[in-house]
Structure formats: structure tokens, C-alpha cells
Amino acid sequence: MAQIRLKNFRKYESLDSLNLNNINIFVGKNNAGKSTVVKAIMLALDNIRSLRWKDVTSKEGMQSILISPKPLFRFDANGFHNLHIGTFERAKCNWLDDRRIVIALEYNGVEFEITIAGLMGDGQVSMPIEKLKISVPFHSNYEFDFSKNTMTFSLGEKLANDPSSETQKAMWWTNDEIAMAEKDVEEAAASGDALKVAEIQQNLQKLISRRKALQSELKQLEKKGEIAHATFDLSYFHESVGENILVQYIKTFIMIADTPITMKKNAKGYSDHVSKVQYLDENRKVIAEAADKLEKVLSNIFVDYIPAHAATQKLILSVDDKQDINSRIVHEYFQENILPGESADRFMKKWLKEFEIGEEIYVKPLDGEGYYVKVDTEDDKVHLADMGMGSIQLVILLMRLTTIGHRSESSLQPWWIIVEEPEQNLHPMLQSKLADLFEDFTQTFCDPYTHTLIVETHSEYLIRRTQIMAAEFVEDCGEDMMDEMIPFRVFYFPTEKGRQPYDMQYLPNGMFANKFDPGFFDEAGRMHMEILKKSKKG
């Protein structure tokens, strides 16, 4: 399950782990911290995916050399969206007297924890990473402490415990079989069946031999269990300039296992060092698996940010206008070349009808200069620019979701999609349908992975619709399956300093277990009561 945790980042002195679902609704007053979490996610993932070795050319002899491999964290990373952070000083929590920022998140089955230490007042755009932890849950863990120049490997809980427990189970079964065989020998001897006694005794000897082998294996596993982790001086295995530095750091553990031990046998710490190297050697397959998984994850980080934007009624959308989000979305949708009958095409047509916009859209290029968009309604083909602001807003959103869905089918990887206030310009009924749209998106484009959506919203109607859908999921599948079947999770962000965002938690009937702060769900009712009071006075 995707998650995010923060310390000393912008609004948050400390943000407890937010465990995300497929579709996550962030709600709260302005400046409550919703965008802070979103920015932390994009900033961290942008940095993680782009860490590479730096290759420079020396002045002497023009030979290629490597500069220090200590990775840098860039606060001006804007690969997914312009985050407007820029420096360490703007990233940290202003009122907390701590020079360390921690961002921890889980992405596609790998957990990352990054610690950056900086100084205030220097306008530092990038800072060396002080500590980096990488975990493949239940598999293996890696920690690189650049302040102490150490690197540590340990097995995940499942791998650390399973071998011994499986051997122990085999021991129990063997002991049971031995006890039964001994009883059978006694019964056969009492009946005077010498042939059967000999047959059972032969099997009994095999069982006893198996037990001895299992006892020996258990002793070896117990000996291995004495090493909970292996820590070494920080070093690195450099294979290629283009490979992500994190993958190469993990591969370094295999390099250490392959390097002959030069320490003298009578040197202090020799036995401990040998045990740690053996621990790496015994787990080289585990380390190689982690490196392969990490390489795949880092090569396929897909994040898309769909900002709240003004619906434009420009007839021609220029390809040269890089600042116009509408132009970019239309351009990329056209370039995707979605064919009739594909799932992305069916998705687009379905939701054009659901939102009562039309039957189909047509994007027409203008000699490489730009595009115009027409919508096929029941009566005619209408320029999108001539439609209402709400329809324009929805078509742009649908084009972006369709583009992402089509791309995800090619990449076969999950995406993180962040949608900012999609309810702008929409009638309340259409706002509620956004919940159905997002749920259908995750169902249509979910093979083989499920995407993670984060929706920042102030729409009561969208949230109310998720409650109805949650209750319907429970009716269809039963209360025991509600956690698996409900794709939504609503997080409320309080504005008060020190308070944590919290999961509203759906009940089986669709109601929330927790309450919103005053001013959200209760605001319409409060104003209605005010009107009633005034009408009575009149």
C-alpha cells in the first residue's frame, strides 16, 4: 500500500504515515497542508528517479573520472510540476529548530526514507543526502549513512524468519512420524509379525536419519540468525554512468562478498568481518533480486499532476504555448494516436455521454501550429471553445485521464495521478459523478497494476457520492470484504498547528466513523438554519 511520512517539511513538524488507497480524497480548509503532502511526494520521487553518477573529464589527459558519489537532493526538482520550493530554507518547517528534513514514502513495492541536512539562510538549491534507507518489505533492507560513511544490509522479517520456521515445522512432522513408527513396531512385535517389524524398523531408521539432518540444519540457521545485519565502510560498485546510483549502491554488497578478504587472521575483528561477508555471500540472490526490482521501479516512475486551471475558450490551441496547460493536454492526447475500439477510446466516449457533453471528440491539427477541438453532439459538431466552461473543464480532464490510461497500458506500470480541484465550474450533479469517473478509471486501466489517485477537493457532492458508492460495495460484497472493495479513502486536513490529517473511515452503511471540522459538511445546514431564523423574524 502506498504511503507517505514527513518530518520538518514545510507545514509539518512531523506527519504520521498516511496509508493511501487507490483513490484518495484530500479535503480541508485552505492552507491546511494538502498541497504540502502532494509536493513532498513529487519532490521525493523526482529526486529518487534522477540520481545518477556524475561523469566529468579531467584536465590532465582528458581521461574520464568520477566525482564524489554522495547523492544530492535537489529542492528545485520540477520534472513533474513546478513546485515553487526551490531551496532547503523554503522546504523546511519554519518554526522547528531542526536542520534535518525527512521524507519517507512507499512507491510500487519499495520503501524509501531520505534524510537531508542543510543550513538556513544560504539559499541552498541542493544538499547532500545524509542518510538513505531502502526497503523491499518482507524481503531485504539497505541503509546508507553518508555522515558516518557506512552501509548496512539486513534481511526483511519474512526472509529472516521463514527458513528456520519451515525447518522447525519439518522437525515437528518428523518427530510425529517417528513416534507413530515406534508405536507400530511395538504393535507388530506384540502380534509376532517379524517381517512387518523389520519393514517398519527400516523406515524408522530413515526417519531418524532425516531428524539428524534437520537438527544439523537448524543449528546452521541458528548460527546465521546470530547476524541480524551486516555493516561495512561505505563503498560503491560503478558499472555504468547511466545507471541509477541507488541500484549500484545495493550491487556493492555483492561486490564486497566477491572481494577476497585481505585482513590478517589474527587482526582484531577478523572473525566478525568474515561472518558478515559470509552473510552477504549466503544472501547474494536476495540482494540481486532487490537490485533488479529497484532498477525496474526507478526506471518506471510515472507521476502526473493535473492542476486546477482556468477553462479557456480559445478556438486555436497553440503548440508553442508551453504555459497553457490546455494546449499541452490536447497536444499529448492527439500524439497518443488512440485507435477506435481501444479501451481508452471507449473510456472517453462513455464519459462524454455520462457528463452529457456529446458522443465523441475530434482533435484537428493545423499544419503543426496548433489544434482545435470539436465535440460531436446529437445535433452537430460544435467547437469545444463554444461550449460552457464546465464542459471545457471536463473534456480537458477526460483527455488527460484517457492519455494516462493509454500510456499505462503500454508501460504496464502503475501511475500516481494528482488532480487538483476537478470540481471547478461544475454543476453539483456533475461534481458527484467525478467519484464514478475516478473509480471507473482505476477499473478500466488496472491491469496488471492499480494506479494511485490523489484528489484535492472542496466538493461536498463528490465526497457524498463516495459514501453512497462505499455502501453499495458493502451491499454487493459483504462487510468482511469492505476494506478490499472500497477504493476510496477520505483524509481530512485540520488547519490547527500540530494536528494530524486523519482518515474519515467508511462505515458499512456509508457513513463516516470520524467527523469533519466545522465549516465543511455542516456549513449548508448552518446557513439553512440562519435563513429559517430570519424568515421567522420577518
List the model feature ranges, each with a label.
Residues K133, Y305, I396:
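Short hydrophobic beta-strand segments that form the core of ligand-binding sensory/regulatory domains
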Residues H528-G538:
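A cross-taxonomic marker for long C-terminal extensions/tails that follow the last structured domain
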Residues Q3, Q63, Q124, Q168, ...:
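Residue-identity detector for glutamine
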Residues M1-S299, A470-D483, F491-Y492, K537-G538:
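P-loop NTPase switch/coupling surface
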Residues V185-Q201, Q205, S209-K212, S216-K223, ...:
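Extended helical coiled-coil dimerization/tether regions that scaffold
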